[in-house]
Amino acid sequence: MSRKRTSPNRNVQIADQIQRDLSELIMREVKDPRIGIVTIQSVELTPDYAHAKVYFTALTGDPDKTQEALNHASGHLHNLLFKRLHIHTVPTLHFHYDQTIEKAVEMSRLIKEANSTRAKDDDEAGAPAKDD
């Protein structure tokens, strides 16, 4: 007997739907004061849909406290998703703070700093020597 495999496209569709639903549910249904303005960046599902890594950014509040609060509310969010999604297995939610934006800003800063240092070194190397 062959096992039915899920298509990668279906996995992406379900992850996208979970992302949209979680964004709405967190905004409307979760009343934890530790959770400020949150954006769900992406959702990664395991092939069997048993677990979902949910990556978020927080515009306000402490990211660690927000992550703790979201993981605390994950059971409630799981139940709300179960009522919305029409799939056999609704994944267990695991929230992770997405540091992509901070890392990109830091990389840009480092590149800018390296370029300005290089330009300064080039200017000093190309400048004519002063006569006293």
UniProtKB/Swiss-Prot annotation:
Q: Name one GO cellular component term.
A: cytosol
Its keywords, alphabetically, are:
Cytoplasm, Ribosome biogenesis
**Major localisation:** cytoplasm
Q: Could you state one GO biological process linked to this protein? A: maturation of SSU-rRNA
Question: Which compartments is it annotated to reside in?
Answer: Cytoplasm
Superkingdom in the source lineage: Bacteria
Keyword match Cytoplasm? yes
The GO terms describing molecular function are: ribosomal small subunit binding
How does it associate, per the subunit comment? Monomer. Binds 30S ribosomal subunits, but not 50S ribosomal subunits or 70S ribosomes.
What the protein does comes down to: One of several proteins that assist in the late maturation steps of the functional core of the 30S ribosomal subunit. Associates with free 30S ribosomal subunits (but not with 30S subunits that are part of 70S ribosomes or polysomes). Required for efficient processing of 16S rRNA. May interact with the 5'-terminal helix region of 16S rRNA.
What family does the entry list? Belongs to the RbfA family.
Q: State what protein this is by name.
A: Ribosome-binding factor A
- This chain's source organism reads Burkholderia cenocepacia (strain ATCC BAA-245 / DSM 16553 / LMG 16656 / NCTC 13227 / J2315 / CF5610) (Burkholderia cepacia (strain J2315))
